[in-house]
Amino acid sequence: MDREQSVQHFLDLLKKSRRGNFKIYIGMIAGVGKSYRMLSDAHQLLESGIDVKIGYIETHGRVETEALVEGLPVIPRRKIFYKGKEIEEMDLQSILSPEVVIVDELAHTNVEGSKNEKRWQDVMDILDAGISVITAVNIQHIEGLNEMVQDVVGIEVKERIPDIVLEQADEVVNIDLTADELLARLKAGKIYKPDKIQTALNNFFKAEHILQLRELALKEVALRVEKKVESTIPENLGVRHERFMACISSNEKTPR
């Protein structure tokens, strides 16, 4: 499914349910383009006449992502003073009127005193209010994959979302890049600032780690799609779960 078809499918879902529809972009690691893709979707929805607003977006200073924020309505963040510092959080109470809201950093832990402890709980409230949500999360923040990711990279990630959050999604989409493409983006300064690049290369961004994380992300999304098929298509239709393998030679003279 290409991007235009994906957005159209989401538009179709909007018309079918009173509860907001829920779309999650999954990434194997930071920098694959989840926020960029959400903002691209938002522009297409806006052009289609859908009332879409940004509830919370984290650009991480990435120029390409910041450029896409331009032209999109943004709900101002709530400012809270906590331990002597001003902290900005998503303003849940102000997200009342749009049809669709963009909410980044799904696994985020809210500052003390917020209505909910976790942002994914905010998202559940938004959905229950009849507002659709497009959000994003990396696989290391998914509870069911947390230990496997820790085995791969040797780092325990504290902020997590329960698997049931994914099970409630109407769409789960994997944002994929090859290891070479991702490392090229990192080294070009498109993911982290220069002083953080080497640390990233020594941890999550080792080539062998990326390959294993990519496999985990692909398997997770495939599992969610399979479960969605099983829960929505009647058994009497006799759906077959096919598996295909394509072998493509690197020799340009080989017939394709």
Q: Where is each model-derived feature located?
A:
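Loop/turn-to-beta-strand initiation segments
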Residues: 51, 97-100, 129-135
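Short, glycine-rich nucleotide/cofactor-binding loops
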Residues: 26-35, 111-114, 238-256
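Conserved P-loop
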Residues: 19-91
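Conserved ATPase-coupling elements of RecA-like P-loop NTPase cores
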Residues: 105-120, 144-147
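Long, charged amphipathic helices and adjacent flexible linkers at domain junctions
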Residues: 197-245
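Pre-Walker A adenine-sensing motif
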Residues: 5-18, 234
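Substrate-engagement module of ASCE P-loop NTPases
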Residues: 118-138, 160-161
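Internal gly/pro-rich beta-alpha loop/helix module
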Residues: 135-198, 203
